[in-house]
């Protein structure tokens, strides 16, 4: 095959922005092909289209001879393509070990146990990961994560390996080892094509064929030598800059003017044995350095080596665990606002306000830095002119190109004319022209205004522009000096070689070069049936989800303890029983008859007698404070009038009506007690009652009339509707947030396999929780039991299948865990509480309310739970409900499959 991939008139846009604009490209087979260019030019979008994880919008994409617009073709190609998405280890699972990660990927491709073990052994031996098979992926170094990601990609012998910026953020030594490993693997596995996106031009020098991209278009193709020759430049970086479209009069290149040293001047920044620990992790380990005023001081190191943490300590944003620092000879204290007036800080992420214009961002920061009002407008105009932002002063930041946003961020950082600028990787993802323009501005600030600049970077050519640099690794400064001094000190030809030499003395055996001698493509492969491959893929997600859940104490606690806590709090806290009513008496009669009346109230558990009151003013205060619910005043002469029998004696009773239901029930209790009191007196005196009819009330099913007996079965329904749905929706959305959803999109996994595989662990946990809740109902709340336990268990099984499926359906429309939890809780709780029979029977609801209730599974399970607990229902009584729960389970699964996207837009 001459071409591994072909793109014809391909365009791809995100809203109004073109990521790819009419791209036509033929990628040769059997070679290492590089896509070069800064962030945002369309490299990742192009690779996503080739890998099949993005949906083609316009044009044709053909990979390995198959049309990627055909879903069947994409599924078939899933076993021939390997895709490593952008972000170090982003497709790996941090809580799983090296072995478990690779076992998961092996299952995704339907490999049987013996084949998986053989391939894992072969790949880990070849990459040097064999000694670390049981180490969690989250605890691997950057270089080891690279190797593990590569092993995961190679476990099924792909014909096409797609790598999206695989070396971004790792140190130069790990970068070099990674590409040497790729070269050795390609020598063993002949015929494999590799397509790589990279922002490192020096890295691209080793590729066979390149496609240079800018602004969504391919601007040049050919070998590195061809591109350099055509541009008439010695390096790819310079050649790429030469190919970029330039505005008339635009300056190219950067010249570092010499700095005039000030003898005896107080250093701008001094760090003394700075240490920063986060729990047991040491991010910064005894870092010391001195930066004189006006110097450009560079921090060079990989992601996670402690650069950003050190910078935050020097701005006062983080308190050091040990050590201290000085700014211009003054001790820097945490929260020292005066010191911050001397600092301009530019973080890795743009800290601009998207809803404010360029001018408004500058005006806001001018106010935040307390620039006097009379000076503020003048200073904003000066900065707009200085950074060439006047023409776009009324534009919003999000609509600006990355290079201009970077310039605006620097303008914001310098609005208060600080003496120190701390810049944390400010040029990441910016094209070389904008990067050069940015550096010219930094050099001007340093040389013309004496501003001290402390900057971190990944780019070697940027580090060479610094007056001095420090090489940092694993929280420690390895060396400090000028670029030339460091190069000569290590006996190297370039600064990158000097950094690699410094790292080689520090790295452990885990980062040692790999040996691919045992690597072979001839692993015994047994062709598995289609059913076995499908089961293997489903079980891969079930096993992985179970392992991740068990190793996440927070999620595990929520899944197991959450239902118990909710049941106890709601079971004991939500009650419609009206008892322990406090009452007070003002007995002005003080006769046996009046005391007998008071005793009629105090002798039953529904009432608790408080201290007597003596006046209506005191009664008002008691009622206002809520100290009593009922008050009774017995007038003088009550007993005498009662014995005479000529007229009915009068008493006064006050009831707190602030809670109507409680007040009405109290009134009913009171009338009942007074009636009983009168009947007892009639029986004793021999006077017959005038009442001709006696009514006695009895309650079916809940004869004790305890609300807990009615509430607990309904609470089981509510809890099983809420917790399992939230757990299952988080499980899917976490894949989107962490980036591991790429494993689903770039492999042969079908949507139903993905969903059911992730759903199964939560079905098991939810069904286990059901039995725990039933136990609490029987033995803690002493709810009577009359029905069939197996029937209730069967209904509960279908119910939790439905509720976990409901959570997965919600996850298809959300992108973050916070939004998923919120949406699931709101959508589940409102109809469940109001329309599922929890408060009012579904049959008594208005037609629209009843329709809403019956549209959710809770309304079908609630009668089953209550009926089997209290009414003795059997299978014949609830068969329709169980059938409907099974239908809900199927409907939610089908809707989830339809809503889940196998490809990104």
Predicted regions and their residues:
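Helix-to-loop junction immediately C-terminal to a conserved catalytic motif
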Residues: 51, 315
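Extracytoplasmic/periplasmic domains immediately adjacent to an N-terminal transmembrane anchor
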Residues: 528-709
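Conserved ABC ATPase "signature" region
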Residues: 103, 107, 114-132, 363, ...
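Membrane-spanning alpha-helical segments of multipass transporters and channels
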Residues: 245, 569-571, 590, 611, ...
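Conserved ABC transporter NBD signature motif
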Residues: 59-70, 76-79, 323-333, 338-339
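Catalytic Walker B motif of ABC-type/P-loop ATPase nucleotide-binding domains
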Residues: 161-164, 421-424
């Amino acid at each position: 095959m001459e071409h591994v991939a072909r793109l014809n008139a391909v365009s791809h846009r995100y809203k109004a922005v073109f990521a790819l604009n009419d791209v036509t490209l033929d990628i040769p087979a059997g070679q290492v092909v590089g896509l070069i260019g800064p962030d945002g030019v369309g490299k990742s979008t192009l690779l996503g289209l080739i890998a099949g994880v993005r949906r083609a919008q316009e044009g044709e994409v053909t990979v390995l001879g198959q049309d990627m617009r055909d879903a069947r073709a994409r599924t078939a190609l899933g076993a021939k393509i390997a895709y490593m998405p952008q972000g170090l280890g982003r497709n790996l699972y941090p809580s799983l070990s090296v072995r478990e990660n690779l076992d998961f990927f092996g299952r995704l491709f339907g490999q049987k146990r013996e084949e998986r073990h053989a391939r894992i052994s072969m790949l880990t031996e070849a990459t040097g990961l064999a000694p670390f098979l049981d180490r969690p992926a989250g605890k691997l170094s950057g270089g080891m994560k690279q190797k593990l990601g590569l092993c995961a990609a190679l476990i099924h012998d792909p014909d096409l390996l797609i790598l999206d910026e695989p070396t971004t953020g790792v140190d130069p030594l790990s970068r070099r080892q990674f590409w040497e490993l790729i070269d050795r693997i390609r020598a063993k596995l002949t015929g494999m094509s590799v397509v790589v996106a990279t922002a490192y031009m020096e890295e691209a020098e080793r590729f066979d064929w390149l496609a240079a991209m800018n602004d969504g278009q391919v601007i040049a193709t050919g070998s590195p030598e061809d591109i350099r020759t055509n541009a008439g430049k010695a390096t790819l970086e310079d050649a790429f800059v030469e190919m970029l479209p330039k505005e008339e009069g635009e300056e190219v290149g950067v010249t570092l003017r010499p700095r005039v040293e000030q003898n005896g001047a107080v250093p701008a920044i001094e760090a003394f044995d700075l240490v920063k620990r986060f729990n047991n992790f040491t991010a910064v380990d005894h870092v010391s350095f001195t930066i004189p005023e006006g110097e450009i001081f560079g921090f060079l190191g990989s992601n996670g080596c402690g650069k950003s943490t050190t910078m935050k300590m020097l701005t006062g944003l983080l308190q050091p665990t040990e050590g201290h620092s000085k700014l211009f000879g003054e001790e820097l204290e945490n929260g020292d606002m005066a010191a911050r007036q001397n600092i301009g800080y530019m973080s890795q992420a743009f800290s601009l306000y998207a809803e404010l214009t360029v001018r408004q961002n500058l005006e806001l920061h001018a106010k935040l830095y307390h620039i006097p009002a009379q000076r503020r407008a003048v200073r904003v105009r000066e900065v707009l002119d200085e950074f060439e932002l006047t023409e776009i002063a009324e534009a919003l930041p999000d609509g600006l190109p990355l290079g201009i946003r970077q310039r605006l961020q620097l303008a914001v950082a310098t609005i208060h004319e600080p003496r120190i600028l701390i810049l944390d990787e400010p040029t990441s993802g910016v094209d070389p022209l904008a990067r050069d323009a940015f550096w010219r501005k930094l050099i001007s600030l340093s040389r013309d205004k004496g501003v001290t600049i402390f900057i971190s970077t990944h780019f070697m050519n940027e580090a060479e522009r610094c007056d001095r640099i420090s090489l940092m690794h694993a929280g420690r400064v390895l060396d400090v000096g000028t670029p030339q001094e460091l190069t000569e000190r290590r006996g190297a030809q370039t600064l990158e070689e000097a950094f690699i030499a410094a790292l080689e003395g520090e790295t452990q055996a885990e980062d040692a070069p790999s040996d691919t001698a045992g690597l072979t493509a001839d692993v015994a492969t047994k062709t598995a049936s289609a059913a076995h491959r499908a089961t293997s893929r489903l079980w891969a997600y079930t096993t992985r989800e179970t392992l991740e859940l068990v190793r996440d104490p927070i999620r595990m606690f929520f899944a197991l303890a959450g239902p118990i806590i909710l049941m106890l709090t709601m079971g004991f806290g939500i009650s419609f029983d009206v008892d322990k009513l406090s009452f007070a008496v003002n007995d002005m009669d003080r006769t046996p008859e009046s005391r007998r009346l008071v005793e009629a109230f105090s002798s039953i558990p529904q009432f608790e007698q408080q201290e007597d009151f003596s006046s209506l003013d005191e009664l008002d205060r008691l009622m206002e404070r809520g100290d009593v619910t009922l008050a009774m005043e017995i007038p003088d002469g009550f007993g005498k009038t009662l014995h005479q029998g000529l007229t009915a004696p009068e008493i006064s009773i006050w009831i707190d009506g602030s809670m109507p239901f409680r007040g009405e029930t109290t009134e009913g209790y009171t009338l009942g007690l007074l009636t009983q009191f009168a009947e007892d007196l009639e029986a004793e005196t021999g006077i017959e009652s005038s009442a001709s009819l006696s009514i006695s009330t009895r309650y079916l099913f809940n004869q004790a009339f305890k609300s807990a007996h009615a509430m607990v079965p309904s609470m089981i329904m509510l809890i099983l509707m809420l917790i399992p749905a939230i757990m299952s929706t988080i499980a899917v959305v976490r894949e989107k947030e962490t980036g591991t959803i790429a494993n689903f999109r770039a492999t042969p996994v079908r949507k139903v396999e993905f969903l059911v595989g992730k759903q199964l662990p939560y079905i098991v946990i939810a069904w286990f929780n059901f039995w725990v809740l039933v136990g609490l109902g029987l033995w803690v709340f002493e709810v009577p039991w009359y029905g069939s336990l197996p029937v209730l268990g069967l209904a509960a099984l279908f119910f939790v299948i439905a509720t976990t499926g409901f959570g997965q359906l919600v996850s298809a429309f959300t992108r973050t865990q916070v939004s998923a939890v919120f949406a699931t809780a709101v959508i589940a709780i409102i109809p469940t509480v109001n329309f599922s029979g929890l408060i009012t029977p579904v049959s008594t609801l208005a037609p629209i309310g009843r329709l809403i209730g019956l549209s959710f599974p809770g309304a079908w399970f609630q009668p089953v739970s209550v009926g089997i607990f209290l009414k003795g229902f059997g299978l014949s009584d609830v068969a329709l409900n169980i059938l409907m729960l099974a239908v809900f389970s199927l409907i939610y699964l089908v809707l989830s499959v339809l809503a889940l996207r196998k490809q990104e837009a």
